[in-house]
């Protein structure tokens, strides 16, 4: 219904709307219904939105929760879409996507975490990595992670 009206909005708002729509219901029942590559690209689109629209701080606040979820899903998987099926070997599709993401988006705030995840020998206890990402998300000055006025 809204699709026909979106094109009447300013470009920055059209891009915002498309990010929200493309992030909607990507993981029903804790399982991804998009590929790892699509997830990586969606995460990168959020990050590109910040660079393209640096003055849209209010919209960043509205994207914040989805962005955090995308980071967690990309790095740790979901209950029904794990990154490793035996806690030792990384899923090959995940590995390929992390490697592609690192190469394609070297300046992404997610890239250092993907690099570190690739160094893991086992995937049965990633609490230290999870905590590290959580701390980064809570303390970062990155526009999609900064404290928002209503969220303080």
Name each model feature, range by range.
Residues 1-152:
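Acidic, polar-rich low-complexity tracts and alpha-helical solenoid repeat scaffolds
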């Amino acid at each position: 219904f809204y699709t026909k009206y979106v094109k009447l909005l300013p470009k920055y708002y059209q891009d915002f709307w498309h990010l929200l729509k493309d992030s909607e219901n990507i993981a029903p029942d804790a399982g991804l219904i998009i590929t790892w590559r699509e997830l990586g690209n969606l995460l990168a689109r959020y990050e590109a939105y910040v660079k393209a629209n640096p003055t849209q701080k209010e919209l960043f606040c509205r994207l914040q929760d989805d962005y955090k979820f995308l980071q967690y899903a990309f790095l740790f998987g979901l209950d029904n879409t794990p990154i490793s099926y035996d806690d030792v070997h990384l899923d090959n599709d995940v590995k390929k996507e992390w490697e592609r993401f690192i190469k394609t988006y070297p300046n992404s705030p997610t890239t250092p975490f993907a690099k570190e995840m690739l160094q893991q020998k086992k995937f049965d206890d990633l609490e230290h990595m999870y905590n590290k990402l959580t701390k980064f998300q809570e303390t970062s000055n990155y526009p999609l992670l900064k404290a928002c006025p209503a969220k303080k």
